[in-house]
């Protein structure tokens, strides 16, 4: 699975490291980028299961970011899907959204994936939706699953960090909300962010909007880059991986 952050701007006023929008005239180019990236990764031995078209598409301040409302993503998936199929990559899933349960409190973006599924052509190419837990509640997935139970749901990002270092509480709450909460609502899998960071919370982008206080699932000591400390997300993932069988 991979998520993308890009900054291809729509006009001069959007010429920024953050919050630009993708020109419709660049849809073919962006789709070709996906094709070439997947081909290179597979050549290196990585089997790409799924992609999202933009990480946190409603986040104007991410590092780096591109604003991609559902209206834009609805049109781009109609270009990306055929491009992947033409390149023999039709088995790579395309997941919509990849953002928070509360749609970043943007009223016009509520039901983001459902709005895209309502378009017959977009529906054909969209395999499911991806979700983060930085805002809103996992119960948002109830409607998403009930309305389109045939479409996949993946949880694709949550972080731990300095803002709440309580190991026990994070361990229990995250397993309850992220793993059990999504899987019982049709979830197909969980990805946590990041897998590993060092004891200085890096590496991270120096640009505004990057997380400089996040922990990895594992912390590696920067003095030797050998000694590791297992954090709550490591134990969450280890437990789920031990008891959930592939294909379940």
Enumerate the language-model features and the residues they cover:
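Substrate-binding cleft and catalytic face of glycoside hydrolase catalytic domains
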Residues: 1-119
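Hydrophobic residues within beta-strands of alpha/beta enzymes
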Residues: 49-51, 129, 190
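Glycoside hydrolase catalytic-domain groove-lining segments
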Residues: 82-94, 121-164, 178
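Surface beta-strand/loop "capping" patches
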Residues: 247-248
């Amino acid at each position: 699975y991979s998520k993308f952050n890009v900054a291809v701007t729509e006009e001069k006023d959007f010429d920024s490291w953050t919050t630009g929008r993708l020109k419709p005239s660049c849809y073919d180019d962006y789709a070709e980028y996906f094709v070439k990236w997947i081909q290179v990764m597979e050549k290196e031995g990585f089997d790409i299961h799924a992609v999202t078209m933009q990480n946190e598409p409603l986040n104007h301040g991410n590092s780096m970011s591109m604003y991609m409302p559902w209206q834009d993503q609805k049109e781009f998936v109609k270009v990306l899907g055929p491009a992947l199929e033409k390149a023999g990559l039709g088995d790579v899933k395309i997941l919509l959204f990849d953002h928070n349960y509360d749609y970043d409190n943007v009223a016009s973006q509520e039901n983001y994936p459902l709005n895209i599924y309502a378009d017959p052509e977009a529906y054909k190419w969209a395999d499911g939706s991806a979700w983060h837990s930085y805002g809103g509640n996992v119960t948002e997935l109830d409607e998403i699953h009930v309305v389109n139970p045939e479409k996949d749901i993946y949880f694709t990002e949550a972080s731990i960090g300095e803002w709440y270092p309580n190991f026990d509480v994070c361990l229990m709450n995250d397993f309850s909300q992220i793993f059990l909460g999504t899987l019982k609502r049709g979830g197909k899998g969980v990805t946590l962010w990041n897998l590993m960071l060092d004891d200085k919370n890096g590496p991270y982008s120096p640009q505004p909007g990057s997380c400089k206080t996040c922990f990895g699932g594992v912390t590696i000591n920067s003095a030797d880059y050998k000694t590791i400390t297992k954090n709550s997300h490591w134990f969450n993932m280890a437990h789920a991986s031990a008891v959930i069988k592939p294909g379940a």
